[in-house]
């Protein structure tokens, strides 16, 4: 599903954000119908990075109760200043171990777990905070050097070691398809993702995420 930025002029009201969300959900439903998939199995995660507090508050009023951020310290500031909203914050970007302490304090979900060093750093900080964290293992199914994530062949060994980190609740895999009009290259990545998915650990649940970004 292709969503160009030009398709989504910046919304200026709760009503406009709600209308944008409805349009995206309709497109998701249509795509699911073509694929023979239940739309309820797809979760839309609006991304609020660089979006100011006023517009985020409008987005929440329009029904966005889970938001994605890839700049950890910016996300923590937002979580603290908007604690009254009850937003579930999902960290979607690559994480350095020295930023694990921030994620452990506020995030409900981390979608880019790709090393045991990060798993250990999160485990230690979550113990101090007495919290748990939902995580997705990031897999580089497109084989692009510019992207983070495990190679599909490394997933099985990696996930077998994750039960040692009991503060991490493994929910599934996260991957980004290659951005190209060449359909077969995209499908090849999908096949690699399917192979990697068969390696998830016993305590994990399958997680399916549609990455689409309506502008808040």
Q: What feature does the model see in each segment?
A:
Residues 1-215:
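Conserved alpha/beta-domain cores
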């Amino acid at each position: 599903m292709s969503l160009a930025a030009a398709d989504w002029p910046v919304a200026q009201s709760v009503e406009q954000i709600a209308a944008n969300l409805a349009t995206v959900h309709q497109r998701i439903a249509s795509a699911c119908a073509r694929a023979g998939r239940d739309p309820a199995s797809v979760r839309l995660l609006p991304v609020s990075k660089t979006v100011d507090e006023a517009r985020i508050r409008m987005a929440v009023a329009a029904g966005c109760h889970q938001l994605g951020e890839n700049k950890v310290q910016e996300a923590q500031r937002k979580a603290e200043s908007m604690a009254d909203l009850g937003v579930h914050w999902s960290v979607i970007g690559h994480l350095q171990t020295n930023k694990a302490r921030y994620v452990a304090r506020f995030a409900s979900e981390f979608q880019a777990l790709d090393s045991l060093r990060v798993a250990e750093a999160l485990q230690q900080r979550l113990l101090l905070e007495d919290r748990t964290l939902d995580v997705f293992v990031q897999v580089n199914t497109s084989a692009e050097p510019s992207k983070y994530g495990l190679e599909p062949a490394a997933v099985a060994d990696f996930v077998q070691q994750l039960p040692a980190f009991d503060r991490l609740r493994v929910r599934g895999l996260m991957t980004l398809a290659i951005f190209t009009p060449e359909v077969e290259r995209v499908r090849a990545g999908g096949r690699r993702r399917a192979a990697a998915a068969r390696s998830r650990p016993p305590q994990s649940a399958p997680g399916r995420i549609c990455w689409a970004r309506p502008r808040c």
